[in-house]
Amino acid sequence: MFGHKTLTDWRAICIFEKCERFFTLPGGSKGGVGKSLFSFALVDYLLSRNANALLVDTDTDNPDVFKAHKDLALPNLLCRLNSLDDADGWADLLDTVQNYPDYAVVINAAARTKTSTTSYGDIMKEALREMRRELTVFWIINRHRDSIELLHSFQEVFTDVPIHVCRNLYFGEARRFDMYNSSKAREAVEKNGMTLDFPAVGNRVADWLYSRRMSIRAAQPEMPFGTRAELQRWRGVCAKMFDSALGEAS
């Protein structure tokens, strides 16, 4: 299907019975909506539940999520860089996932991934069905119209895939996401997925993670007391959000 490459597992983002069986795609198809911070939170959520996690950063131009996690010496965390700009990149991703069947997969999707996802979406879904994996998507949005337009375009390709839309509360309270809240896109989302609220975190925490390129796991013991307390508050709220979408992992 990708020429000489062999299709195998793809990314599903469902926890259901086992963390290791899901493949997550934090997306949004544009920059600046909070996909990277969401990926930080999702990896932390999995590690806190002792799941095996395979982090794949597809933003090869600015792989901040990869750089923040690659030096963590944890036996249950693997980190990879993988461009999805062409067919070979998608095939490489599938081969990587096949090699780690007992790992939950977190894909930090680059903003430019929309075009290739549209091109290879049907192949991806077919591969998942063959491997008996289920695809679910986290779609992070801000309050702008293009977030809704990009979501609608994505829904046209992935009509049968559960999509969890995450209102990034950094951009305002949930009630202020007027265009999404009253949209037909939301109605479609909530037939198979959920509308979630991704909690805002204090600037001092975000600055610490980004400026030092540190994972949550590595940063926590080094933070000043107040910063660490805010991080812990935010982690707790994020965990409740992930539990509601994925089911409590055990």
Predicted regions and their residues:
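A conserved segment at the C-terminal end of the G1
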Residues: L37-N52
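NTP-binding/hydrolysis catalytic cores, primarily Walker-type P-loop NTPases
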Residues: L209-S250
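Glycine-rich phosphate-binding P-loop
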Residues: P26-F40
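Extreme N-terminal, non-catalytic leader segments
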Residues: M1-F23
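A general structural motif
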Residues: R21, N50, D102, R132-E134, ...
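Conserved catalytic-core segment of NTP-binding enzymes
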Residues: R112-D207
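Nucleotide-state-sensitive switch-loop elements of NTP-binding domains
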Residues: F16, E20-L25, S48, L54-A109, ...
